[in-house]
């Protein structure tokens, strides 16, 4: 039996295996709202161009709103035989208002531009949702930054002790990463602002339509100027997948450090019991599962990006069925990102900063060595490389004594070039605030950085 909406050209029915293999309804039904939104805009445009009558438009809009209500209330029956969400909605619409009017909705439109429009609307909405979540996470980081300007901790390079910084300075580094993530999403949202609706299969339509009107109704800033590009383009999906992948690069780095810093070896932070789990055999265990899962999910969102890049890499123009595989990975990445950002934000709100442990850790690894070298250059006019060698000898002597250079009582006993003033440098807070360059760890600089971020999120 031939009951597919495209079956007029065929003399026989599709094999049941093909129907099941070909169908995307279980995935793309996520787009029901966008599909109805796009159809209402398309029908409105058709009526304005005299292609639909006013009473036909009214019936279509009323019918589509009923379909939306049925889906939202769980009353809509999804049938795999309908193939995709577009056909499922159109079939139900025709059942409600009759095929004579319902069948007119698809005038001057193809599923090719229809799905591209639906998907782009979903992507645009996802950008906005992710920007909001990133804003909230930045705000949480800013709250920590405001409180911990004088909470001193070691910074690391190569995971070795480097220089003293504040926890404020540390967490602001991640806040600025997230600021770039927001800007990246904003740029991608700008690029996604062109409507493919009305491109039809690939070459446009012989009807005198008004693509600018439907684009305006749907909130696009303009139309895609080439119909073939309109239905072939999935850059907007790749952009969002890439943006999410970079977000996870940043959150994964943060989570890795939260895992390290909450371990017994560091004990810089304590993660709330609400966001930790135990062991089935070891009673003492408190595991940072949230951080580990976000770190693990990073591979998942990377995979979704690589998957679509591979799908698109050699596709001829215009639409190909391969592109049906573009949605599942995107839906997964968006949900994964939203879920992860929400729980990471709440977890960060509740972490406890162990100030004393952070400060004690600064007394290992000779964090003040660079300050001593800079002092020799600045006060004794010694070339930096020579100063580097002199301070390296101080470090070696301290290690022989089994102490950190911050614990040395008299530097002049190691090298007479050091005077009493040099001893003032052996202070972590002094080191922190001695930095004068823009973007440094000093309290004055940290306050400027906080202001930059506050002004940025105010505009979101």
From Swiss-Prot:
Its BP terms in the Gene Ontology are: arginine biosynthetic process via ornithine; L-arginine biosynthetic process
Q: Can you tell me which residues the record assigns to a coiled coil?
A: none
Q: Does the keyword Cytoplasm apply?
A: yes
Q: Where in the cell is it found?
A: Cytoplasm
UniProt cross-references to InterPro entries, sorted A to Z: Arg_succ_lyase_C, Argininosuccinate_lyase, Fumarase/histidase_N, Fumarate_lyase_CS, Fumarate_lyase_fam, Fumarate_lyase_N, L-Aspartase-like
Enzyme group, top EC level? lyase
Q: Which Gene Ontology terms cover its molecular function?
A: argininosuccinate lyase activity
Which pathway does it operate in? Amino-acid biosynthesis; L-arginine biosynthesis; L-arginine from L-ornithine and carbamoyl phosphate: step 3/3
CDD domains tied to this protein: Argininosuccinate_lyase
> What EC number(s) would the UniProt record show?
4.3.2.1
An annotated GO cellular component of this protein is:
cytosol
Catalyzed reactions per annotation:
2-(N(omega)-L-arginino)succinate = fumarate + L-arginine
Keywords, A to Z? Amino-acid biosynthesis, Arginine biosynthesis, Cytoplasm, Lyase
State the similarity comment. Answer: Belongs to the lyase 1 family. Argininosuccinate lyase subfamily.
Record-given protein name: Argininosuccinate lyase
The scientific name of the source species is Campylobacter jejuni subsp. doylei (strain ATCC BAA-1458 / RM4099 / 269.97)
């Amino acid at each position: 039996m031939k009951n597919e909406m495209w079956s007029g050209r065929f003399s026989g029915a599709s094999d049941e295996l093909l129907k099941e293999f070909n169908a995307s309804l279980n995935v793309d039904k996520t787009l029901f709202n966008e599909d109805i939104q796009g159809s209402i805009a398309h029908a409105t445009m058709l009526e304005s161009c005299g292609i639909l009558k006013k009473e036909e438009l009214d019936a279509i809009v009323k019918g589509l709103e009923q379909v939306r209500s049925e889906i939202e209330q769980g009353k809509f029956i999804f049938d795999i035989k309908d193939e995709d969400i577009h056909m499922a909605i159109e079939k139900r619409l025709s059942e409600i208002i009759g095929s004579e009017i319902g069948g007119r909705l698809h005038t001057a439109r193809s599923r090719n531009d229809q799905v591209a429009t639906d998907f782009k609307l979903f992507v645009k909405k996802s950008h906005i949702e992710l920007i909001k979540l990133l804003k909230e996470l930045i705000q949480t980081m800013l709250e920590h930054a405001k409180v911990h300007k004088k909470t001193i901790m070691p910074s690391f390079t190569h995971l070795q002790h480097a220089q003293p910084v504040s926890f404020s300075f540390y967490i602001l580094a991640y806040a600025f990463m997230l600021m770039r993530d927001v800007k990246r999403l904003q740029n991608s949202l700008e690029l996604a602002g062109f409507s493919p609706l009305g491109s039809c299969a690939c070459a446009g339509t012989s009807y005198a339509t008004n693509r600018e009107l439907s684009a305006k109704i749907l909130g696009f800033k303009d139309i895609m100027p080439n119909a073939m590009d309109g239905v072939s383009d999935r850059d907007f999906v790749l952009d969002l997948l890439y943006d999410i992948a970079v977000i996870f690069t940043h959150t994964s780095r943060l989570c890795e450090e939260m895992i390290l810093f909450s371990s017994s070896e560091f004990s810089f932070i304590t993660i709330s019991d609400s966001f930790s789990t135990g062991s089935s055999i070891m009673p003492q265990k408190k595991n940072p599962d949230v951080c580990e899962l976000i770190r693990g999910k990073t591979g998942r969102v990377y995979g979704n990006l690589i998957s679509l890049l591979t799908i698109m890499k050699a596709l001829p123009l215009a639409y190909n069925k391969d592109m049906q595989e573009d949605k599942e990975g995107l839906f997964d990445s968006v949900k994964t990102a939203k879920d992860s950002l929400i729980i990471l934000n709440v977890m960060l709100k509740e972490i406890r900063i162990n100030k004393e442990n952070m400060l004690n850790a600064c007394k290992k690894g000779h964090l003040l060595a660079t300050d001593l070298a800079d002092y020799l250059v600045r006060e004794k006019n010694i070339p930096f490389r020579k100063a580097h060698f002199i301070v390296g000898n101080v470090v070696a002597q301290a290690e022989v004594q089994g102490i950190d250079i911050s614990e040395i009582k008299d530097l002049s006993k190691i090298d007479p070039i050091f005077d009493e003033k040099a001893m003032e440098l052996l202070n972590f807070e002094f080191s922190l605030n001695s930095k004068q360059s823009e973007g440094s760890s000093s309290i004055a600089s940290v306050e400027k950085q906080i202001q930059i971020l506050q002004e940025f999120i105010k505009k979101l």
